[in-house]
Amino acid sequence: MASVSHPSKIQRQDTGVVTNTTKKPILNLFSQRSDCKYTPAYCEENVWKLCQDISTRHSGELQHCYVVFVSNDSRTVPLWRQKAGKEEEKLVIWDYHELFLYTPDDRCLVYDLDSELPYPTYLHKYVTETFRTDHILKPEYFRYFRVISASLFLQHFASDRRHMKRSDGSWIKPPPDYPPITSAANPHNLDDFINMDPTKVS
């Protein structure tokens, strides 16, 4: 089974005996990026598909998985190291973005199908290279985050893709090759997840 290695840690006990306290490798949920269902410009559905895949192949790990929406009131969030970015730093200003997190213990892996970073990437490296710091940004570009458990996201998320259509009904970007994701309660609730108002819970 593929896994992600973690640096070894050697600790000396009071007895003077050196004990190896190496953490066990983290299960690599997706062996390679190309194995994942991916449609450019539909990050919310890409992540939903990752959650669905885990619920089928590694159902016991779903409790350790989370979905993170990134946005703000002005819908302008700068992210670096994005495949759609231009020039050397690969900067993109999205209206929103979405990530998949896996936290089996005190370690955390980020799966971002739109990033040029390794797949997956440890959280600290991902945050450092993708978000950098708000100190260099104007307030309208500050990033806010909504974190949802993968199981709840699977159960409640719905999108009829209306946000990807122009007023004449044509597509801004080609849609995925499968039917829209629906829930029993709502045909479309994407805006509820993107909304960063802390008083409104998805």
Residue ranges and their predicted role:
Residues A2-S202:
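A structural boundary/capping signal
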